[in-house]
């Protein structure tokens, strides 16, 4: 798209959403908004409330309890938005009276979790001809479903954490002894399509299996039972489209039994992030190369965070791929790029540029 008369592109930051990660998304939005270069971009803030309604927000007062991770929330809506698709982008209008607002050139979504990073919003934005920061519909959908992620990666020859997939229809009473016999103990039981460790339980004996499974099924109709891995948690950040770059490696040192939601977002000081991770150069290179291979195999573009286990025996296992990583003050993705020489404002600018490039590529193959 051509720049506007002001010479600036208009970036819409989308945040909130209906998922269990609503509050995490609000926290991410603060950092992204702060980092956007106002000399280059005009800004539209779109908050999505827990009912799925799009609201036009004012940067000065769009959040309540912004300094409290447990109580942060959207301020009451001033007006609800509707979106009208057009040939050269989408037009925002006031849903009540049809009053138009400036059109959007690029969307920067931090709508974490269901509907926000599973391909739903990505599909909407693509239909609306709005470039957006993050993978396309397919890459987003596949990476959101941890079972499908593993299937694609196994086919691509990328080693993944051993697991068993259970469905709520038919597998609500699985053969626990057989699963323990196959995977051993401890086990991690998790919803297939949740993030931020929501609904995840560590199971150390047979007695805890049923409750952990019931919790996971509260959040998804598909559940993964994963082998507990003894080793280190290593993460990498990937950036780019056809020729992605990979950051330095970082390590998570969690004081809890695993890196749970509370540790990540409510008790951030209890989880240590070591960047760069203390790794032999050949291991770090292998991790970064595997991250790149997984990113391309899964059809990712613009950005993703790729998480690994490095076992006590030195084996690398890919744990999961997050196509819309956190941008909070404690989030690993921006910290990894900062350690790689790309500060927060430069990272956000790069993501916006990549979003536009990805949209141009998609338009050429229609």
Swiss-Prot record:
GO terms for cellular component: cytosol. Mg(2+) 2 binds at residues 320, 322. One of its GO terms (biological process) is cell wall organization. Gene3D superfamilies: 3.40.50.20, ATP-grasp fold, A domain (3.30.1490.20), ATP-grasp fold, B domain (3.30.470.20). Pathway: Cell wall biogenesis; peptidoglycan biosynthesis. It is an enzyme of class 6 (ligase). ATP binds at residues 180-235. Binds 2 magnesium or manganese ions per subunit. InterPro entries: ATP-grasp (IPR011761), ATP_grasp_subdomain_1 (IPR013815), D-Ala_lig_Van_CS (IPR000291), D_ala_D_ala (IPR005905), Dala_Dala_lig_C (IPR011095), Dala_Dala_lig_N (IPR011127), PreATP-grasp_dom_sf (IPR016185). Its main location: cytoplasm. Coiled coil: none annotated. The keyword Zinc does not apply. One of its GO terms (molecular function) is ATP binding. Residues 150-353 form the ATP-grasp domain. Its cofactor is Mg(2+); Mn(2+). Mg(2+) 1 binds at residues 307, 320. Its EC number is 6.3.2.4. Keywords: ATP-binding, Cell shape, Cell wall biogenesis/degradation, Cytoplasm, Ligase, Magnesium, Manganese, Metal-binding, Nucleotide-binding, Peptidoglycan synthesis. Belongs to the D-alanine--D-alanine ligase family. HAMAP family: Dala_Dala_lig. Cell wall formation. NCBIfam families: D_ala_D_alaTIGR, PRK01372.1, PRK01966.1-1, PRK01966.1-4. This is D-alanine--D-alanine ligase. It comes from Sodalis glossinidius (strain morsitans).
């Amino acid at each position: 798209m051509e720049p506007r008369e002001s010479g600036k592109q208009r970036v819409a930051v989308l945040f909130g959403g209906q998922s269990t990660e609503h509050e995490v998304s609000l926290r991410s939005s603060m950092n992204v908004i702060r980092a956007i270069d106002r000399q280059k971009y005009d800004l539209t803030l779109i908050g999505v409330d827990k009912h799925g309604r799009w609201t036009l927000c004012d940067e000065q007062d769009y959040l309540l309890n912004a300094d409290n991770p447990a109580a942060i929330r959207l301020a009451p809506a001033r007006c609800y938005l509707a979106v009208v698709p057009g040939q050269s982008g989408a037009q925002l209008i006031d849903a009540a009276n049809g009053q138009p607002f400036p059109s959007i050139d690029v969307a920067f979504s931090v709508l974490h979790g269901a509907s926000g990073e599973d391909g739903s919003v990505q599909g909407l934005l693509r239909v609306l001809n709005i470039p957006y920061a993050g993978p396309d519909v397919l890459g987003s959908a596949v990476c959101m479903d941890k079972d499908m992620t593993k299937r694609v990666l196994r086919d691509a020859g990328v080693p993944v954490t051993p697991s068993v997939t259970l469905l709520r229809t038919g597998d609500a009473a699985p053969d626990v002894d057989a699963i323990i016999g196959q995977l051993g103990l401890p086990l991690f039981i998790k919803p297939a399509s949740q993030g931020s460790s929501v609904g995840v339980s560590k199971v150390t004996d047979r007695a805890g299996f049923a409750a952990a499974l019931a919790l996971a099924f509260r959040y998804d109709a598909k559940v993964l039972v994963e082998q507990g891995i003894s080793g280190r948690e290593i993460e990498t950040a990937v950036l780019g489209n056809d020729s992605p770059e990979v950051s330095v490696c970082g390590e998570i040192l969690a004081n809890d039994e695993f890196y749970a939601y509370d540790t990540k977002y409510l008790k951030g000081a209890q989880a240590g992030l070591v960047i760069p991770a203390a790794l032999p150069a050949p291991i770090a290179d292998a991790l970064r190369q595997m991250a790149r291979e997984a990113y391309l195999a899964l059809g990712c573009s613009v950005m993703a965070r790729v998480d690994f286990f490095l076992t006590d025996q030195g084996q690398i296992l890919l744990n999961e791929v997050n196509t819309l990583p956190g941008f909070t003050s404690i989030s690993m993705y921006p910290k990894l790029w900062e350690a790689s020489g790309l500060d927060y404002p430069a990272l956000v600018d790069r993501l916006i540029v990549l979003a536009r490039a990805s949209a141009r590529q998609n338009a050429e193959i229609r």
